[in-house]
Amino acid sequence: VLAQLPEAVLEGDDGLRWQPLPTAAPEATASLLECRFAVVDVETTGRRAEQERITEVACVTIERGRITETFASLVNPGMPIPPPITALTGISDELVATAPPFAAIATELRQHLSQAVFVAHHASFDRKFLTAELRRADETFVWTAPTLCTVQLARYLVPGLDNYRLDTVTAHFRISNPARHRASGDALATAQLFLRLLERLIEQDIVAVDAVTALLAKQKRTTRRRPLPGEDRHHE
């Protein structure tokens, strides 16, 4: 399902120095001002990407500081959805019974991911699941796009919060999410959060993708710890 978002959501900040979009896939040295971003959220049957499956996926595209389009689809995982997952997300076996399998949406989803920096809240979780599903659909698939995690970005740019669950960080920025624990709602909230964090990076003159990834890698090494209660990806 491809959908245009309301005009109020699509409008960007004209005060930022956005540049024309590139035609090639983003390099690590690319400027944040030039990049296309694919902000993604997945809902799944569990935590292990190799054993579990995606039940819903959404991708929000950001170009030149504006949310321009969204893709969202329920996915038939081909396996039962555990009751605790249904209780959390509202996604049941009945809801996905007539949904397409992941392979049926893989090509369209790849179009949204192509030539884009991958962004997600707890990005390693979403990327592992997407990589596993995309490889099942096409065993030759290779994904080299840079990745930015809004959890790590928020820890660096908004220090001192009680935790960095999506609810907590979006509340800090007064971003609403009426569809919590559904891929479309969480992806849109994450995209709006990322735009706020992107503004702060640019204000600090951190404008290269590789500069951001290096900064986050350094921060991760110095702040490595066990997750706080409630920070588990399935209960964030």
PLM features per residue range, with description:
Residues 142-154:
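Conserved beta-strand -> loop -> alpha-helix junction used to position metal-binding or nucleic-acid-contacting
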Residues 4-15, 23-29, 195-236:
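Acidic two-metal-ion nuclease catalytic site recognized across multiple nuclease folds
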Residues 182-195:
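Acidic, divalent-metal-coordinating active-site segment for phosphoryl/phosphodiester hydrolysis
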